[in-house]
A protein has these predicted regions:
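Short loop/turn segments at strand-loop or loop-helix junctions that form parts
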Residues: 27-28, 66-68, 103-107, 113
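Conserved active-site alpha-helix within GNAT-family acetyltransferase domains
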Residues: 106-130
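Short hydrophobic/aromatic beta-strand or adjacent loop that forms the aromatic wall/cage
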Residues: 10-13, 132-137
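Core beta-strand residues in small-molecule sensory/regulatory alpha/beta domains
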Residues: 15-17
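Conserved GNAT acetyl-CoA-binding A-motif
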Residues: 61, 90-111
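Conserved acetyl-CoA-binding loop-helix of GNAT-fold acetyltransferases
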Residues: 69, 75-90
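Conserved N-terminal entry element of GNAT/NAT acetyltransferase domains
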Residues: 1-7
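Conserved acyl-donor/pantetheine-binding loop and adjacent beta-alpha core of acyl/acetyltransferases
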Residues: 19-66
């Protein structure tokens, strides 16, 4: 599997391919200002509480907004490989100890938010807040 970067956005969009076949992607938002991210999360998540995230170095970090696998490729083991490649990419661009924030949230009925959080925890993410309807906020 390979990835390509879309330079036409402020976010980093990784596209994953198996040969010429598009498998899915990842959306990574650089965190220039931690307070801006906290405001953004507060606006989009009803019961978000940013106090715990304030303990982490957010400025200069990254917000992993989404990793997705195209519907026809789900269940073929691509997600784990895409997550590993995404984390390798993030680790290359963040070397100053800044944090990576994500939301373990699934719209796929075959994988729960808790299962996603379990997978992310294998990569060093810790749970900060389990929201009612908007997934689990995690940080590394």
């Amino acid at each position: 599997m390979t990835n390509e970067i879309d330079d036409n956005t402020n976010d980093v969009i990784l596209g994953f391919f198996d040969g010429d076949e598009y498998i899915g992607g990842a959306d990574i938002e650089p965190i220039r200002y931690g307070e801006k991210l906290l405001d953004e999360l507060n606006d989009s998540i009803d019961d978000f509480d940013g106090r715990a995230l304030r303990r982490y170095k957010l400025d200069g970090g990254a917000y992993l907004q989404d990793i997705w696998v195209e519907r026809k490729h789900r269940g073929n083991g691509y997600f784990s490989e895409m997550l590993k490649m995404t984390m390798d990419f993030i680790n290359e661009i963040i070397s100053d100890g800044s944090s990576v924030v994500l939301r373990a949230y699934s719209e796929n009925s075959n994988i729960t938010d808790d299962k996603l959080a379990e997978i992310y925890s294998r990569y060093g993410f810790v749970e900060i807040q389990d929201t009612d309807d908007d997934g689990i906020i995690m940080v590394k």
